[in-house]
């Protein structure tokens, strides 16, 4: 069964190592029958803790469609890529959003923002009272 997946990949931060590992990941995806790639590069970030003695890494998110039977073999091959520090592949779920819920949420946001704006702007009676005191 073909499913939509989203993979988050963490590579070494060096430019050449990053590009070669990214190409290797793409080759493996194609080899296991992945289609409809959508790539999103997040860029280089500092890591919260060292991963394989690396303090910085480059993140790449790739969305693709693939048969679910090939996922285990793909993960086994991804573990062999030297400059790929970590990866996570998730099934992408498209949720249907009810129009009623969206309208209700938008109304609540409008109502809350309206209340905040009224509190920020002084009413005329408060301004008149301040003028009479002074």
Curated annotation (Swiss-Prot):
Spans annotated as Disordered: 113-134
Composition bias type Basic and acidic residues, residue spans: 113-122
Disulphide-bridged cysteine pairs: none
Name of the protein in its database record: Small ribosomal subunit protein bS6
Coiled coil: none
Pfam families noted in UniProt: Ribosomal_S6 (PF01250)
Keyword Zinc: no
Cellular component, GO annotation: ribonucleoprotein complex; ribosome
Keywords: Ribonucleoprotein, Ribosomal protein, RNA-binding, rRNA-binding
A GO term, aspect molecular function: structural constituent of ribosome
Alphabetical list of SUPFAM superfamilies matching this protein: Ribosomal protein S6
Gene assigned in the entry: rpsF
Family that this chain belongs to: Belongs to the bacterial ribosomal protein bS6 family.
Database matches in InterPro entries: Ribosomal_bS6 (IPR000529), Ribosomal_bS6_sf (IPR035980), Ribosomal_S6_plastid/chlpt (IPR020814), Transl_elong_EF1B/ribsomal_bS6 (IPR014717)
Superkingdom of source: Bacteria
GO biological process annotation, one example: translation
Keyword rRNA-binding applies: yes
